[in-house]
UniProtKB/Swiss-Prot annotation:
Family: Belongs to the ATPase B chain family.
Keyword DNA damage among UniProt keywords: no
Gene designation: atpF
Keyword DNA repair belongs to the record: no
Organism ancestry: Bacteria, Pseudomonadati, Pseudomonadota, Gammaproteobacteria, Moraxellales
Gene Ontology cellular-component annotations: plasma membrane; proton-transporting ATP synthase complex
Name of protein: ATP synthase subunit b
HAMAP family membership: ATP_synth_b_bprime
Membrane-topology annotation of the record: Single-pass membrane protein
Length: 156
């Protein structure tokens, strides 16, 4: 065998092998590589998108949290105002009630004073009538009259 002929035969076999590979194997291999590259690119894009979505979600959560805190603060402030208003209303109502009770007590005291005065007037008039009866029954002299008035004054 001749080396040249062997080299030419091997070169032809290699060329056929290369043509066969380029015709049948290379497109499948390039398709797999291209598909893998696309999957990797899609994965990287998805990771970037997920990272952006995460940042957006974190910002949204922070905004929601700030909004919730503001609402909670507003509710607390409103509850405090309502409680203070109820306290003020209760104080005002207690003052009105206290004033009403004082007024009733004054009226009751005034009524009792008037009743006592009326009772005293009645008693004084009865004593005056009794004194006048005694004076008229007795003889009217200065000494007897003074004694009766002293007795009447002692009874008063």
């Amino acid at each position: 065998m001749n080396i040249n002929l062997t080299l030419i035969g091997q070169s032809i076999a290699f060329a056929i092998f290369v043509l066969f590979c380029m015709k049948f194997i290379w497109p499948a291999l390039m398709g797999a590589i291209s598909e893998r590259q696309q999957k990797i690119a899609d994965g990287l894009n998805a990771a970037e998108k997920a990272k952006a979505d995460l940042a957006s979600a974190e910002q949204s959560v922070e905004q929601e949290l700030a909004t919730a805190k503001a609402k909670a603060a507003a509710l607390i402030e409103q509850a405090n105002k309502s409680a203070n208003q109820l306290i003020e209303e209760a104080k005002a109502q207690a003052q009105v009630e206290g004033e009403r009770i004082r007024q009733q007590a004054r009226e009751s005291i005034d009524l009792e004073i008037n009743q006592a005065r009326e009772s005293l007037r009645t008693q004084v008039s009865e004593l005056a009538v009794l004194g006048a009866e005694q004076i008229l029954k007795e003889k009217v002299d200065q000494q007897t009259h003074a004694n009766m008035l002293n007795e009447l004054a002692a009874k008063l």
